[in-house]
């Protein structure tokens, strides 16, 4: 084992990174070696056990905890580890598999062992239900009483150093906008769980010399601060923060290959990225960065809210947010603070003590007495109150949580660190949409291992080839509830969601709640009627277009203006949209850098969708999807809502940070996002004639109607000019399109059809040719996302099909002539959606579970369907 491990160490040293953490098999062999260690290897073996085994409920942690417990109990001897030393090492394992052992050791007759166990447990936060065991034991056991007293005092927090009054750093600046694809490039998605290896790809396209510059700046002797005009836009991937912190953060004791801390300064910091930085123990600061340049040595005064240069002159000021941020940094991150503070509060409550004054508590904003917006009511309901005012720190219940395959392995690792063995969120979904089409060996292993990891914790796991996370997760939503997901496009069309990085998603799934600083809302009101040839995707692009006309959004990154940044977009005026259509609007709020979104729909629309989804989930159970109990519970709650349908509405006197009216009567032609920025929206007529080499019709922004319409445009027109990619969002869409003969039309057009999933959208597997111009229905058009040097337009499927037909962006006249002839007369037939309850015998399609072996809702819930 040691020889193989040393070879691995040498291979990694060539890359300048540490070895991988030990797995369970290696840890088992290590523990055997430690029973009779070779003299020359004693120090190395101890280092491996202490520092290179993952904590929490990792399989290797299970082996380590068992070995150390056996030493502490005298069942195994190790010449290098005393009984007390074993207990001390158990105390470094954060929580999970070490907790029950430490509780048992509180009862040891060896007072040194019992005392060491008390010390170890006093700084262990991830105890969850074991809290009750320690509390009960404290009535009769003095060492358990020590633990309870330490938790009540907040000793875990007191023993951590405060954030200094002044922090001197060296600036590393990336001018303009840095998105998460720059920091965590999609083609390297498979390496994300391996933080040091993945971090080698940071800025490889944006600033290839960047990592060398950071290494040089570190020689000045100060920490390096990451600085940018706009930082962290785009995907929610926690790997972006992981990579940044790997280069500018500090090692976390006893947690291999992960770093915390660090300083991030941005003119604008995207909300998900900001939150993920908080969770990871970094100090993110929004401030004017115009006077900051690479190599500058500056001093940050966090409590005074100013930054000075080497001469002591103030060059910029800031206001820390949230008000608890310094506590978060001191605790090692927002998540450790929340867990630790909750443990201290819970302990003090059990002892009849008042809340601890040790922590900065969020200040509730003044109640204006005004009404609440729809979003504020939804979050209020999840917090057990009528509504939540902007600026309120709260922890809403997470009814639905989503995870996909390029973030799922990181979420799994975070869940292990959180010592999670079962989900408290009502439904947690894991999908395989980003890697199913062209899996690498590591992806195939993920496809094999991750479903069981999630389903054994009460989650639901989809299968490779099923399709896109959002197209499925939306079908599992309950109206007026709150959720999250490890993908920035987790933008519920029913209820509201706040997408997050993997750490916060793991927290939400494990604990069933999520911390939220309630954002302000911007109301987008649609008026007028959709004009001929104008699609819903054009209305998606009309939102930033109107905002730009009003000076509320700019494309330039220096002094960027974005009225939507960090706010909730609340949309109304299109109540009769189908839910699939509504998702086009909510989905695209990710590109506006919104923290979340809502859309007001009619009860009839929502009821139609839920009736369909009940049948889909029953079919999933028939097909053997797990966890069936979770699916049954969600079916029961949907049927309960259908029995008594009711939807929340915003109050007429609710207050918004801004109101933007989009008059559909004024949108006379398609609007596209031009290369290479989703905010760079233009009228189609401004781009007419631009040559298009490749066309992609796919992504979560599409539904079955788009493919029918595209096929109608292509039908009988021969082979398209250039390359056409077709990728439906789910296997159900694909099956229906095949049955309707649509795939035959795509074949005749020379299209390349892809397995249902994300395909080109993220650019982590299939990619377009270098340097081509693309028209795409996908979500984003960041530089190099779909292909190296690719220039990408974003717009509707209908316009995409016309571009494929003509090999260029059409004039308004060309476009309207085609769609008025080929689409408009058939709209009722083309834009039909998948209502599974209207498909004969759909519930039994692909059945592998016999009817008499199907679990029953009454058995799962212990109550009849629809019971209160």
Swiss-Prot record:
GO terms for biological process: propionate catabolic process, 2-methylcitrate cycle; tricarboxylic acid cycle. This is Aconitate hydratase B. Binds 1 [4Fe-4S] cluster per subunit. Gene3D superfamilies: Aconitase, Domain 2 (3.40.1060.10), Aconitase, domain 3 (3.30.499.10), Aconitase, domain 4 (3.20.19.10), Aconitate B, HEAT-like domain (1.25.40.310). The keyword RNA-binding applies. Involved in the catabolism of short chain fatty acids (SCFA) via the tricarboxylic acid (TCA)(acetyl degradation route) and probably via the 2-methylcitrate cycle I (propionate degradation route). Catalyzes the reversible isomerization of citrate to isocitrate via cis-aconitate. Catalyzes the hydration of 2-methyl-cis-aconitate to yield (2R,3S)-2-methylisocitrate. The apo form of AcnB functions as a RNA-binding regulatory protein. It comes from the Bacteria. Keywords: 4Fe-4S, Iron, Iron-sulfur, Lyase, Metal-binding, RNA-binding, Tricarboxylic acid cycle. It catalyses: citrate = D-threo-isocitrate; (2S,3R)-3-hydroxybutane-1,2,3-tricarboxylate = 2-methyl-cis-aconitate + H2O. Substrate binds at residues 192, 235-237, 404-406, 488, 780, 785. GO terms for molecular function: 2-methylisocitrate dehydratase activity; 4 iron, 4 sulfur cluster binding; aconitate hydratase activity; metal ion binding; mRNA 3'-UTR binding; mRNA binding.
